[in-house]
């Protein structure tokens, strides 16, 4: 029987058929570079669109457009309530075009249309409206001073928050719309201008969203999009002297390179990088909760999630039960195209990434690791990798220490919780972790001792706009989200008045 597919909207096909350029100064236009980048549907491997491959001159045009918009105060100079209204209108337009954006996301990235609708658009709308509300909550403080000179003088002082300037937002390919808006919205809420560089693999939704931003009333030059390679376009953007802040989400290796570049100009930087995230399952945990929670926490978006649980440490009394449960769950997953409403595992984003993930599994198989695999997906089509459990892998295997970023999960037997903690923290990463237990005292103790920026108890990979998120160790620097989110996009100015 032919697997059902969601019908592609006519406006989506029309957008795919365009000759895409860049989005600079409030309008789409051609790049100076004549090079093009092909965009492929991961489910078929077929080209579906192309975009400009921007060069250094194109990036300079975008940054200078953002700079002119910033210094003219055409956005930062507006009343906070007016900026808030425009950003809420922007969110409303994204909601009105939600199915269009969800389909574009699935066609270029490969993920399930259900995930595109619920996460890429649904969660993005929550973040957009939350962040729009912060626009009118930016506040400084009044301060009492103890300056003794000249004798008898009195002082009044306060601080104020001012937008940092032009922001460079570097967006990964795993959640292009959602993570893109995590950079756009705080920048705009704070009064900054921004230049977004989406991944060259998945640039389409950011180009479309930029058009909606202009329609909402965001002034020309405030929101710009350049598409191109990291080596040329990304490097030119992060090294530009008029960029005041860089917000990057991606690999640790690339993040380190950006940090070195930023140091040359003392550019402010927020880095959300890789993770090799542990889950500790204690012997009193509810097996059903564990299997349901960690199947999502591990295999959401084919494991292409920085926060995914890729190492599961299970106390011995529960190990066999959970291995059996996970095996049954993995083998029941339906594998197919993202535009299929019934497929639960979809293709990886690109041929190159598919080959990389397969290399980890080939290495494990060569070392005679025990692999439990689900369905391989459609034969001869797309970039599919079967969801895979690796049981008690040798510590020397690459997949025990390196971020695989695919549908591959290690199940490891441990004698007790202390061994699990030692193994969980024995990594260069520190993005997320979880502990599974019905004992409140153990939950609190383990959440304290796990070395990760976010620790969940009896859940994994659940985030919220009001909860700060970021990494320890080599998983990054800085925090996104939460009521103080905009502090990272503002300068703090001190004002002192003698009277």
Swiss-Prot record:
Keyword Signal: no
GO molecular function, one term: oxidoreductase activity
Location of the active site: 272, 306
InterPro entries: Ald_DH/histidinol_DH (IPR016161), Ald_DH_C (IPR016163), Ald_DH_CS_CYS (IPR016160), Ald_DH_CS_GLU (IPR029510), Ald_DH_N (IPR016162), Aldehyde_DH_dom (IPR015590)
Pathway(s) where this gene product acts: Amino-acid degradation; L-phenylalanine degradation; phenylacetate from L-phenylalanine: step 3/3
Function of the molecule: Acts almost equally well on phenylacetaldehyde, 4-hydroxyphenylacetaldehyde and 3,4-dihydroxyphenylacetaldehyde.
SUPFAM superfamilies: ALDH-like (SSF53720)
One annotated Gene Ontology cellular component of this protein: protein-containing complex
Family in the record: Belongs to the aldehyde dehydrogenase family.
CDD domains: ALDH_PADH_NahF (cd07113)
Catalytic function, reaction form: 2-phenylacetaldehyde + NAD(+) + H2O = 2-phenylacetate + NADH + 2 H(+)
Other known facts: Can also use NADP, but prefers NAD.
One of the Pfam families matching this protein, by short name: Aldedh
The protein's assembly and partners: Homodimer.
Protein's UniProt name: Phenylacetaldehyde dehydrogenase
EC number(s) per entry: 1.2.1.39
Keyword vocabulary terms for this entry: NAD, Oxidoreductase
UniProt GO BP: 4-nitrophenol catabolic process; L-phenylalanine catabolic process; NAD biosynthetic process; phenylethylamine catabolic process
PANTHER family, sorted: ALDEHYDE DEHYDROGENASE-RELATED
Gene3D superfamilies given in the database record: Aldehyde Dehydrogenase, Chain A, domain 1, Aldehyde Dehydrogenase, Chain A, domain 2
NAD is among the record's keywords: yes
Binding positions (NAD(+)): 250-255
């Amino acid at each position: 029987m032919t697997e059902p597919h969601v019908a592609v909207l006519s406006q989506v096909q029309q957008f795919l058929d365009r000759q895409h350029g860049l989005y600079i100064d409030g309008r789409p236009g051609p790049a100076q570079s004549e090079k093009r980048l092909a965009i492929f549907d991961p489910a078929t491997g077929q080209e579906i669109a192309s975009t400009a491959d921007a060069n250094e001159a194109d990036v300079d045009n975008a940054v200078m457009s953002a700079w002119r918009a910033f210094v003219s105060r055409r956005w930062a100079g507006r009343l906070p309530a007016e900026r808030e209204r425009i950003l809420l209108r922007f969110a409303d337009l994204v909601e009105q075009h939600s199915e269009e954006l969800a389909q574009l996301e699935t066609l270029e990235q490969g993920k399930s249309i259900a995930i595109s609708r619920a996460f890429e658009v649904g969660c993005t709308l929550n973040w957009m409206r939350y962040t729009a509300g912060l626009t009118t909550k930016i506040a400084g403080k009044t301060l009492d001073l103890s300056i003794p000179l000249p004798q008898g003088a009195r002082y009044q002082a306060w601080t104020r928050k001012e937008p940092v300037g032009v922001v460079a937002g570097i967006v990964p390919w795993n959640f292009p719309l959602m993570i893109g808006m995590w950079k756009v919205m705080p920048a705009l809420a704070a009064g900054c201008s921004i230049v977004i560089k989406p991944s060259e693999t998945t640039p389409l939704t950011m180009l479309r969203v930029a058009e909606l931003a202009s329609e909402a009333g965001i002034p020309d030059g405030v929101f710009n999009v350049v598409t191109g390679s990291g080596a040329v376009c990304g490097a030119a953007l992060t090294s530009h002297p008029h960029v005041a802040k860089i917000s990057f989400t991606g690999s640790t290796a690339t993040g380190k390179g950006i940090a070195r570049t930023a140091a040359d100009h003392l550019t402010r930087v927020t880095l959300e990088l890789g993770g090799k995230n542990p889950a500790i399952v204690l012997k009193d945990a509810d097996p059903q909760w564990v299997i349901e929670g960690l199947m999502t926490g591990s295999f959401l978006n084919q494991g292409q999630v920085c926060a995914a649980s890729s190492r599961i440490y299970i106390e011995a009394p529960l190990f066999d039960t959970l291995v059996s449960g996970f095996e049954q769950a993995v083998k029941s997953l339906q594998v197919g195209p993202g535009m299929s409403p019934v497929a639960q595992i979809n293709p990886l984003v690109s041929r190159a990434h598919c080959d990389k993930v397969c290399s980890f599994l080939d290495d494990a198989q060569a070392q005679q690791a025990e692999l439990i695999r689900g369905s391989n997906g459609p034969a001869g089509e797309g970039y599919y990798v079967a969801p895979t459990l690796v049981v008690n892998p040798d510590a020397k295997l690459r997949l025990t220490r390196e971020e695989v970023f695919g549908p591959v999960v290690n199940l490891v037997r441990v004698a007790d919780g202390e061994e699990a903690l030692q193994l969980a923290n024995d990594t260069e990463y520190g993005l997320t972790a979880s502990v599974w237990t019905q004992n409140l005292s153990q939950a609190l103790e383990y959440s304290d001792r796990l070395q990760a920026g976010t620790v969940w108890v009896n859940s994994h990979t659940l985030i919220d706009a009001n909860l700060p998120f970021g990494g320890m160790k080599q998983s990054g620097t800085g925090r996104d989200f939460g009521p103080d989110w905009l502090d990272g996009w503002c300068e703090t100015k001190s004002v002192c008045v003698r009277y």
